[in-house]
């Protein structure tokens, strides 16, 4: 899959979520039937769920596989989105990033506790690292996911819904990109050569 399309499929649902929340009242005025869903955050949640399903469907149709992280995130979006709409309580969709990041962080750190660098099983086809490299990278990403979970809790519990939505779209992604780039020296240091790949 082309990298730009992959990025679009990952960012698309988030942009739909942001736009629907920011322009929800305008959309409801133009399409009154949408008013039955409720406040803009509930409309945004419904469209976020739909966009997530569409993105996963496109990814599956092109590759016949679904990456584990987008798949798990998508399932949580649908479950917590459904709870948000059913109970008419936006707490559930706000807690979704906390649940997903805690889950990923817990799995990675738990794997390390049992001597398994699980990140290697996910990205081994993308690049090859030695055992120490995978261990360090798994530890860093595990702690980073826990950090994101804590930050999400702080933001949604202490700021307005609009601020939380903006941070979710325009804050988390840049932070993640910067963190990813900061891992490049580690990846380069522990990358296996072609000879080492063949030997392994």
Swiss-Prot record:
Cellular component, GO, one term? plasma membrane
InterPro entries to which the protein is assigned, alphabetical: YciB
**Per the annotation, which location comes first and is thus the protein's main one?**
membrane
Q: Where in the cell is it found?
A: Cell inner membrane
Q: Which residues form a coiled coil?
A: none
TM region positions: 1-21, 37-57, 66-86, 103-123, 136-156, 167-187
The membrane topology noted for this protein in its Swiss-Prot or TrEMBL record is:
Multi-pass membrane protein
Give the UniProt keywords, A-Z: Cell inner membrane, Cell membrane, Membrane, Transmembrane, Transmembrane helix
Q: Which domain of life is it from?
A: Bacteria
Q: What does this protein do?
A: Plays a role in cell envelope biogenesis, maintenance of cell envelope integrity and membrane homeostasis.
Q: What is this protein called?
A: Inner membrane-spanning protein YciB
Organism from which the protein derives: Brucella suis biovar 1 (strain 1330)
Q: What is the lineage of its organism?
A: Bacteria, Pseudomonadati, Pseudomonadota, Alphaproteobacteria, Hyphomicrobiales
């Amino acid at each position: 899959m082309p990298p730009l399309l992959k990025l679009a499929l990952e960012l698309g649902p988030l942009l739909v979520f942001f736009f629907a929340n920011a322009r929800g009242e305008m959309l409801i005025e133009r399409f009154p039937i949408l008013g039955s869903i409720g406040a803009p955050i509930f409309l945004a949640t419904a469209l976020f769920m739909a966009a997530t399903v569409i993105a996963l469907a496109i990814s599956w149709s092109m590759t016949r596989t679904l990456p584990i992280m987008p798949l798990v995130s998508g399932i949580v979006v649908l479950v917590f989105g459904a709870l948000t709409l059913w109970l008419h309580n936006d707490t559930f969709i706000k807690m979704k990033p906390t649940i997903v990041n805690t889950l990923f962080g817990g799995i990675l750190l738990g794997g390390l506790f049992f001597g398994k660098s699980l990140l290697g099983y996910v990205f081994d086809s993308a690049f090859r690292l030695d055992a120490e490299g995978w261990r360090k990278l798994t530890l860093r990403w595990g702690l980073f996911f826990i950090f994101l979970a804590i930050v999400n809790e702080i933001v949604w519990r202490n700021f307005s819904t609009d601020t939380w939505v903006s941070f979710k779209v325009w804050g988390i992604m840049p932070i993640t990109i910067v963190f990813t780039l900061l891992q490049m020296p580690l990846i380069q240091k522990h990358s296996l050569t072609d000879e080492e790949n063949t030997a392994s």
